[in-house]
A protein has these predicted regions:
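RNase H-like nuclease fold core
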Residues: 1-50, 54, 58-67, 140-148
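RNase H catalytic domain
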Residues: 10-16, 57-137, 141, 146
């Protein structure tokens, strides 16, 4: 099954302020019917990057069978980690960046890699706050969740 996933994360007073994530999942069933599911949640103390990662994690966790997933995100942090293969280098170096400093949010990156396992996932960057309807919806879900 092909799934399109739009994700966004938000944090107020980044770092360590309240934050939230938003996810919009789309898939078309065998009869040609479009299905949409929205996910969001807020947290008291977090960062924007953790919320960006959690959005993708929660979206993938919502899938009940192996899928071909296209993730649309305005987070260069998330998209470039895969499309520029930063993550491959981090894993090879024991979760250290090329400058030997530890990778931040290792717990979330490991969790993301784990939930990606049954799926074929590709990442596409979209410019945030640029009128893309699903990205705007994810932003609304994330900021509303962050505001509690």
């Amino acid at each position: 099954m092909e799934v399109t996933m739009y994700t966004d994360g938000a944090a107020r007073g980044n770092p360590d302020g309240p934050g939230g994530y938003g996810v919009v999942l789309h898939y078309i069933d065998k009869s040609g019917t479009l299905h949409e599911k929205e996910l969001s949640a807020g947290y008291k103390k977090t960062t924007n990057n953790r919320m960006e990662l959690l959005a993708v994690i929660r979206g993938l966790e919502a899938l009940n069978r192996p899928c071909q997933v296209t993730v649309y995100s305005d987070s260069k942090y998330v998209v470039d980690a895969f499309n520029q293969n930063w993550i491959g280098g981090w894993v090879k170096r024991g979760w250290k960046k090329s400058d030997k400093k530890p990778v931040k949010n290792v717990d979330m990156w490991k969790r993301l890699l784990e939930v990606m396992q049954p799926h074929e996932v590709r990442f596409v960057w979209v410019k945030g706050h640029d009128g893309h309807p699903q990205n705007e919806r994810c932003d609304t879900l994330a900021t509303t969740a962050a505001d509690g």
